[in-house]
Amino acid sequence: MIFRKSISKSPSSKGSTVCFRCGQAFQRRETPISFGGHMWHKDCFCCTKCDKGLEHSDQMLVQTSDGRPVCSSCAHTCTACRMRIKDYALMSGYDSYHRECFRCHDCRKQIIDSNFKRDNRTIFCNDCKQVRHPSRSSDESADYHNFEVDVTIKPTETKSSVESNKSLSIEIMSPQKPPLSPFGGSRDRLVSETPTNMSQAEGGNVPNDGQDSNLASNSADSLLPSAKNRSFSSFTSFESPMKYDDSFFPISPSISPLQKVNKQQQIESPTATFPLSKNTWKNRFHTFHKQSFTPVNDSSSSDSLKPTINEEALDDFAGSASPYKTMSLTDRAEPIVMNGHMRSLHNATSPFRPFSPSYRSSDTHSPRTRSPNVQTHKKTSSQPSDLSSFAQLLSPPQVLSPKPNGGGHKSFRHSHSLSETSQQTLVPSLGSNGEYHLPTNDHSSTPAQSERDSDVEELREQLENLTALTKKLSERLSSSTFDNSKFIRTEDKDTVRSAKLEICEKFFSFADVTDDPTLKDPKHQDLVAAANAYMAMLRESYGTEINNLLERRNELLDDYNNVQKILNESLEASVHLNTKNLELADLNNNLVKQIQHRVPPENQSNLEHTITTSSKNTTSSINPLTAVSSNSGQSSGRPGPLSPNLNVTTRIDIKGKKGSMHLQPRDVNRKVPFKSMHTKSKSADPVVGNEDRTQCDHVFHVNAIFKPSRCYICSESVWGSELRCFHCSISCHSRCLKRLFAESEHEKTMSETVSENSKWMPEMPTRMPPPGPSPTMFGRSLENQLKIEGSVLPQVIAMCVSCVDAHGLEVEGIYRISGSASQVRVLVDEFENGSIRMEHLTSDLFACTSVLKTYLHRLPEPVIPGTQYEELLEAEKIEKEEEKIERVVEVMKTLHPAHLSVFRFLIAHLGRVCKHAEKNLMNSKNVSTVFAPTLMRDKVNRFDLQHATKKSTALQFMLDNVDKILHNL
């Protein structure tokens, strides 16, 4: 069966779509497969390397640079080791390699960079390539790696027309490897025969087997000789043909072991006839193994040539790209089975599919492939063509040159060169016998010269374009009327400025406008005058409104400033009032203590008739939290911790020092009204009237206290969930309840004497006095605290100040906003117990500052005692600032060392707080208002607003000059 198909009129030229592989048009109801920008038959859509049928829905397909599909198995399989590639792959052409498998064929050295050489599909490093194939002269390269191909060219006659031109039709016969004979053994002889008459193949139509019998075997028009003139072609790339059994045996080239395949692998390819036109497929990257040219006779035409091409032969030029079935040139050089007088191929289907080789440079190769455009070979042209198109079709590895011997046909040498960079142009010449002959190849022109010539042509074109562009710019510059002489000195700014002004004057020139006759028209002038009058009216009306709005805005700004001042004053007043409230509370406590201690011992008998004992049995010690039966028969309970569900019943014998506690359930009626025995007293503090002093069985229960009240034991404010007596409604802290039953504390709460000279005092209710100074940290003098701790600063001051320095300098309202009372009590207890941690202080900065102020407030002697305080008030009368600073320093140096160290530490810390007043809003005035009452006290502990203002002023002066004071201290 002869695989010859004429596509002189390509289906694409008729407007139909053809398959990218077989070149055949699609049937009417056939659905093509679109992939890689091309259309495919379902049967033709196969892997380029392994020829395995593919599904278009497969998402793992890989597309080559020319749009051919490759299955995932071939794309991810190493060509060298045949193992699957799981990570990155190095691509060279259509071959994939592991990183460690990408090695030189000779030295087995791993190739890391992209500089390597490639011969066919064999990889060489640069060193091995130079050693293996050193550069040769032009004379040596002419005789190096050649084989003979019988070529005879004659013009053919076709139908003439007005636009007809002479063209040349060349038939290229590709020898392929037929299947082995049944008896085994391969025949390496290549015999090429062509029919003697091709007149019946008009339009490229190939006769069938029946038509072959009508062909004359020895016609005068035969292009190829008969059997006696058969020529043999050696397809070796590196060796010359050698004789074997009276014939030439093609010696296999030195190929990679990966390219060696079994002789059983067969490959077949159809023949093809190519038109030599200017638009014909010009691909310099395909390789031909043998070319034979056959004229096509057409008796109906004598003026023009009709180009024909066998498209199916195009797919066979590059051989197979399968990594598993790689064919060498020698393996393909098998004899062709003769069918009559026409060369025919076996009917077996080729298991291989052609591929488009990658673009390769003669110097370096890159693993990234790039294939040229191979779509133009399907186009036909009726324009005159020459052999230069066919010369471009013959890739650089195979250059045709005429054989010096003569004969009925021309024999050419086919030189297979390793370099793939040169491309020879062949121009046909018409001989005396009417035959076309290829010109002799000039061995003096090397591939490098051809490349240089092409580069020179490109550079000439670029030079012409640049010359034209320069000329165009020169014309534009000469046509410009702008005077650029002023810009000769670019550094002269005055010149540039004057040039700009000149341009603006020219641009805004109204000389031509004034000469316009339209402006002199009376109607136009009236319209302009009316428009100007209207604009003036608008300016006047809107100007008045704008002025009113501006005045309103200024008034609002003034109001805003006034509100800001009032707000600042209110903040200062609130801080001052809070300080005054603390001072008033201290003054109230002091007054109560003074009144209670003024009762003389000799008048103790006068007080006995008002105080009666609640029990005749006295004991020297008191057992707190003892379950005793109540005389009233309410309830009794076991001793245990105080809880909201239990009431604590306490009987107190003030004189007999006896007390008892009863636990009662909460179902006791708590709606007994609180009755104050002093009707004029506005205080909510619990009092004990003269009538009820005889006996009170205190029954404490947990109650929510929201009205201002004082603790019965410590006289401090009570708020929130605390204890309240069910009978007399006195309040008590839960922490102070244990002091009620301590004997030492019980003795301190009893008054033994009453002053004789107290008749002039107003009648006040009698209350239990608060306990004396606590022997704990809060309430201990600085001298004793430093001796106990053995440090320069008390622990409370050091930790609180460090916490504020680290986290609170930019907190708004620091030291002004008080912390939660419950959190403050928790922190105070932790300081007392020694379990305080810095993390506890940083969790609530306001509670931390409140603890510091509480510690300073409870000091028996303030940081600045009364003596130094009086001297500071005298220093405030000094007008000169320097003298005042010196006086303040002198007064501070008279402090006790413990007080002086605390003062230096605190005044430096408060100075740092004032420096961040923009963010924390605590300037020197606000800070002095908060800390002056706690740092300074007079001797008599008097309270008035005048002294409070003097304290704040003195401390503010020290804060404003803190650096100078600390430098001199």
Curated annotation (Swiss-Prot):
<feature type="compositionally biased region" description="Polar residues">
    <location>
        <begin position="369"/>
        <end position="392"/>
    </location>
</feature>
<dbReference type="InterPro" id="IPR046349">
    <property type="entry name" value="C1-like_sf"/>
</dbReference>
<dbReference type="InterPro" id="IPR002219">
    <property type="entry name" value="PE/DAG-bd"/>
</dbReference>
<feature type="compositionally biased region" description="Polar residues">
    <location>
        <begin position="624"/>
        <end position="637"/>
    </location>
</feature>
<dbReference type="InterPro" id="IPR008936">
    <property type="entry name" value="Rho_GTPase_activation_prot"/>
</dbReference>
<feature type="site" description="Arginine finger; crucial for GTP hydrolysis by stabilizing the transition state">
    <location>
        <position position="816"/>
    </location>
</feature>
<feature type="zinc finger region" description="Phorbol-ester/DAG-type">
    <location>
        <begin position="697"/>
        <end position="744"/>
    </location>
</feature>
<feature type="compositionally biased region" description="Polar residues">
    <location>
        <begin position="193"/>
        <end position="202"/>
    </location>
</feature>
<dbReference type="InterPro" id="IPR000198">
    <property type="entry name" value="RhoGAP_dom"/>
</dbReference>
<keyword id="KW-0343">GTPase activation</keyword>
<feature type="compositionally biased region" description="Low complexity">
    <location>
        <begin position="212"/>
        <end position="223"/>
    </location>
</feature>
<dbReference type="GO" id="GO:0031267">
    <property type="term" value="F:small GTPase binding"/>
</dbReference>
<keyword id="KW-0677">Repeat</keyword>
<feature type="compositionally biased region" description="Polar residues">
    <location>
        <begin position="418"/>
        <end position="432"/>
    </location>
</feature>
<feature type="domain" description="LIM zinc-binding 1">
    <location>
        <begin position="17"/>
        <end position="81"/>
    </location>
</feature>
<dbReference type="GO" id="GO:0007264">
    <property type="term" value="P:small GTPase-mediated signal transduction"/>
</dbReference>
<dbReference type="GO" id="GO:0005938">
    <property type="term" value="C:cell cortex"/>
</dbReference>
<dbReference type="GO" id="GO:0051286">
    <property type="term" value="C:cell tip"/>
</dbReference>
<comment type="function">
    <text>GTPase-activating protein for Rho-type proteins.</text>
</comment>
<dbReference type="Pfam" id="PF00620">
    <property type="entry name" value="RhoGAP"/>
</dbReference>
<dbReference type="InterPro" id="IPR051854">
    <property type="entry name" value="Rho-type_GAP"/>
</dbReference>
<dbReference type="GO" id="GO:0051285">
    <property type="term" value="C:cell cortex of cell tip"/>
</dbReference>
<dbReference type="GO" id="GO:0008270">
    <property type="term" value="F:zinc ion binding"/>
</dbReference>
<comment type="subunit">
    <text>Interacts with dil1.</text>
</comment>
<feature type="region of interest" description="Disordered">
    <location>
        <begin position="170"/>
        <end position="223"/>
    </location>
</feature>
<dbReference type="GO" id="GO:0090726">
    <property type="term" value="C:cortical dynamic polarity patch"/>
</dbReference>
<feature type="domain" description="LIM zinc-binding 2">
    <location>
        <begin position="76"/>
        <end position="135"/>
    </location>
</feature>
<keyword id="KW-0863">Zinc-finger</keyword>
<keyword id="KW-0479">Metal-binding</keyword>
<dbReference type="Pfam" id="PF00412">
    <property type="entry name" value="LIM"/>
</dbReference>
<keyword id="KW-0862">Zinc</keyword>
<feature type="region of interest" description="Disordered">
    <location>
        <begin position="348"/>
        <end position="459"/>
    </location>
</feature>
<dbReference type="GO" id="GO:0035838">
    <property type="term" value="C:growing cell tip"/>
</dbReference>
<dbReference type="GO" id="GO:0030427">
    <property type="term" value="C:site of polarized growth"/>
</dbReference>
<dbReference type="GO" id="GO:0005886">
    <property type="term" value="C:plasma membrane"/>
</dbReference>
<keyword id="KW-0440">LIM domain</keyword>
<feature type="domain" description="Rho-GAP">
    <location>
        <begin position="780"/>
        <end position="966"/>
    </location>
</feature>
<dbReference type="InterPro" id="IPR001781">
    <property type="entry name" value="Znf_LIM"/>
</dbReference>
<dbReference type="GO" id="GO:0032153">
    <property type="term" value="C:cell division site"/>
</dbReference>
<feature type="compositionally biased region" description="Low complexity">
    <location>
        <begin position="350"/>
        <end position="361"/>
    </location>
</feature>
<feature type="region of interest" description="Disordered">
    <location>
        <begin position="613"/>
        <end position="646"/>
    </location>
</feature>
<protein>
    <recommendedName>
        <fullName>Probable Rho-type GTPase-activating protein 3</fullName>
    </recommendedName>
</protein>
